[in-house]
Amino acid sequence: MIAPLLCILSYNFNTFAILNVYSKLTMFCTTNSLPMDLLLKQGSLKQEVESFCYQIVSESNDQKVGILQSEDKQLQPSVSKKSEGELSRVKFISNSNKITFSKKPKRRKYDESYLSFGFTYFGNRDAPHAQCVLCKKILSNSSLAPSKLRRHLETKHAAYKDKDISFFKQHLDSPENNKPPTPKIVNTDNESATEASYNVSYHIALSGEAHTIGELLIKPCAKDVVMRMFDEQYSKKIDAVQLSNSTVARRIKDLAADIEEELVCRLKICDGFSLQLDESADVSGLAVLLVFVRYRFNKSIEEDLLLCESLQSNATGEEIFNCINSFMQKHEIEWEKCVDVCSDASRAVDGKIAEAVTLIKYVAPESTSSHCLLYRHALAVKIMPTSLKNVLDQAVQIINYIKARPHQSRLLKILCEEMGAQHTALLLNTEVRWLSRGKVLVRLFELRRELLVFMDSAFRLSDCLTNSSWLLRLAYLADIFTKLNEVNLSMQGKNVTVFTVFDKMSSLLRKLEFWASSVEEENFDCFPTLSDFLTEINSTVDKDICSAIVQHLRGLRATLLKYFPVTNDNNAWVRNPFTVTVKPASLVARDYESLIDLTSDSQVKQNFSELSLNDFWSSLIQEYPSIARRAVRVLLPFATMHLCETGFSYYAATKTKYRKRLDAAPHMRIRLSNITPNIKRICDKKTQKHCSH
């Protein structure tokens, strides 16, 4: 009986374990005066001997041996957790006194010849995994067989099945293949799905699209992309992202609330802020109030949407003020920090906006009010001599005659295409100041030949297109309005200061004087359209036309001076502190001393040439707090109503006649704000995160 036992042990264990088992088992039999054969037979001591043997073997390299099975009951030896993984090697057979051992799982070795099938090894050299050098797919150790590797090559990479080993070796040695493989890990838990839902909703709000686009377009497209580039199983994970209509609406409200919370925190800690407000009506007839705020944050001056509210009752000045005041009190924002209110209502206008501004100045006594400088510019350019005004009105009538009749517009397009014209349609004229009237008149002048052929002789203004004097005046108007619109556009945009606008106006005033002097000398090089037309017809400008042009230019300059008067600017030190040699009247002695220290700093001087005016003074708050805060207070007021005008354009594009019931305020908060929502923070506040079903 001992010989078979030793034979079994020698098959499964090392020599040290065999000797250890045999010696201790012999000692056990001698101590108890029992023959060993008796222990190995069925009997009362059998279980004790088996436990003893298991203990001995467990102490020897954590190996296990099973001894004898009872005909009546199968034994379950107790072993340590460390060795449970190898217990499968021992098989107990009932109705037999024999013991059997299953073989160890076979560990295949990697052979260099496997590279001919496009496979290298990955992981432990003693128990490697097979890795395809083409697709980087990792196979188990059991796949390290030529037949399985060849099958992968022929099914997955049939185009390379006839390549020799040198091809795969070159592919293996490339830099891309030397990078460690990155496992494909797709996190499909509810938290990740929720964050993805917020990200998609954020982009939907930024684009102004309908909420249904998430479920109807974005999710199917995302699934198609993932399925084509990765695998179908990963594509199915996208179904967990919640993008239904109602879910996207809730997500957008959460994002807007987070942005509002961040904005309120910034306003509470800032030194001061200015407001810009305007009111308009939406597609459903509601009065919509937009209020923007300008404030210093960190080392820059920021502009954000303060509120977008629908006025349910009468849109009076008191109602507008109550709406703003309610927001300020709700969030505990101090009115004392308000330094200026910009609107489209001048002091001479007695309207609801003007009334609201007056009420704001009552609760914020130190604040000032300003009139949009673009409005001043628009009012100034409307004044012109009668002869030029008549030409402008007639040009608008010709354009409207074509644009108001779709059939006429189609016929004109066909005619322009046949005549090889650069353009095929006229531009519709509008009185809105930020659209270019210059482009409208230039287009009309460029299509004058096509219009002459197209116009019916019965139309009373058709003779204007053959009148050279009329065309000369039209050419001049096209040029001057193009120049004025360029100035108008240069004053629009974010972070435009009062200094920027007055610099543009100063430049325009000097140009107007120069243009008037040039026309008096019959030099029309400043007006390219007029100059080219004179060359084309080989003619000169009549005295009365020259007189009208000079009168218009000089009158325009005088009107601009009325709306933009040249005054002694006590805040010139803000524009360029390094040119100040005398104490400005607006500064006290201590502030002027701080200004001297500032201008004597070489590093500050270098920063002045590299940074914008807003960023320059904002960056000096820590080092020169007193003088820097005074400068920032001068820079805070809005110069134009550009943000409100842009905001209403976005509002009209978001809340269309097909979405009249939409609450557009959260969309405007996201679309018109420079603050990016903290999606991680929003998700952390959610106690439950559900995936899509």
UniProtKB/Swiss-Prot annotation:
Zinc finger (BED-type): 108-164
GO MF annotation list: DNA binding; zinc ion binding
PROSITE patterns xref list: ZF_BED (PS50808)
Keywords: Metal-binding, Zinc, Zinc-finger
Annotated positions binding Zn(2+): C132, C135, H152, H157
Miscellaneous notes: May be derived from an ancient transposon that has lost its ability to translocate.
Name of the protein in question: Zinc finger BED domain-containing protein 5
Species per Swiss-Prot/TrEMBL record: Homo sapiens
Gene (name only): ZBED5
